[in-house]
Amino acid sequence: MSIRKILQFPDYRLRLLSKPIKIINKKTKKIIYDMFDTMYANNGIGLAAPQINILKQIIVISSLKPTMSELVLINPVILKKNKKYINTIEGCLSIPKKTAKIKRSSCIKIQAINTYGKSFTLTAKSLLSICIQHEIDHLIGKLFIDYIN
């Protein structure tokens, strides 16, 4: 597969809205493979398609712990957010060398589609919850620095 160029802030394309995926075909799967290659080549734990200048609602997340598989989230939607928040230090492949303390929901429930076109729900806690929220923000043109007061 291919390693793609990651858009860097303040590139205006990072602020654009992504469109839902209608059909999962070979082209979609190639984008997903390229996203994983790009994420790992840049030592990331998550990547959203807009970061590689593809305005589609696709997110990939690495296996954050040995018992977890890699995740592909197509057209993800947050169904529920826990009212308990956690503050963590976040960074972003599109904003290198910058981190900030960000407040995120500690637990979320999402709905998404997998690479086989099947809808599923997932409850995510801790780091996975934070990572998913961060990547979903990319799909709506929002960056972690937007949360800094």
From Swiss-Prot:
SUPFAM superfamilies in UniProt: Peptide deformylase
Biological process, per Gene Ontology: co-translational protein modification; translation
Catalyses which reaction(s): N-terminal N-formyl-L-methionyl-[peptide] + H2O = N-terminal L-methionyl-[peptide] + formate
Chain sites annotated for binding Fe cation: C92, H134, H138
Gene3D superfamilies the record matches: Peptide deformylase (3.90.45.10)
Keywords: Hydrolase, Iron, Metal-binding, Protein biosynthesis
Pfam families linked to this entry: Pep_deformylase
HAMAP family, alphabetized: Pep_deformylase
UniProt record similarity statement: Belongs to the polypeptide deformylase family.
UniProt xrefs under PANTHER family: PEPTIDE DEFORMYLASE (PTHR10458:SF22)
Protein name as annotated: Peptide deformylase
